[in-house]
Amino acid sequence: MDINELSPSEVFSYFQEICAIPHGSGNTGMIADYCLDFAKLHGLKARKDTSDNVVIFKAGSSGYEDCEPVILQGHLDMVCEKEPGCDIDMSVQSIKACTDGKMVWADGTTLGADDGIAVAFILAVLASDTIAHPPIQAVLTSDEEIGMLGARDLDTSDLTAKRLINIDSESEGILYVSLSLIH
């Protein structure tokens, strides 16, 4: 079975594209450029900084234009590990995502679902013309796996959202909710 046959197909299509781009920690330039190209293709305002953080802005859908914006956040980098004997150079070669329809895994390497699947979900939401949503500020940070370096360098001067949905978790089926009061 091909990964593009999984549902939601838009998400897994983006995830397969992400797997084709080397994006280990410290090597996020190509995935950041991919996200910028995505924004341009969809007519969305976007920016990339010197740390390879990418921010993409999408106006609210019809009826939601004046709602408070929300940040959708994920990180662009992945932990690059491989099985003994695997000759893939993860700094320049693609990850081969495999599926049996129930599980997704990589052939000989880590998959990069942390946090590539979050980036794929965010891109699918940004690309959709059918999902009702408030204004979205998509924040895609770099080098989370090696100390949240991108988040530390993120320019937040044009981010106006008071709510953030971080799509990254250690446990399947667990939702974490937290609140930080900013004055």
Functional labels for PLM-detected ranges:
Residues 64-135, 140, 145-146, 151-162:
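Active-site metal-coordination/substrate-binding segment of hydrolases
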Residues 155-176:
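A glycine-rich helix N-cap at a beta->alpha junction
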Residues 51-55, 145-147, 172:
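Short acidic loop-to-helix transition motifs that present clustered carboxylates
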Residues 2-102:
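Acidic/His- and Gly-rich active-site-bordering loop/insert found
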Residues 180:
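Glycine-rich active-site loop/lid that clamps phosphate-bearing ligands
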Residues 29, 148, 165:
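Metal-dependent catalytic neighborhoods of phosphoester/phosphodiester hydrolases
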Residues 183:
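Conserved small/polar residues in nucleotide/adenosyl-binding loops
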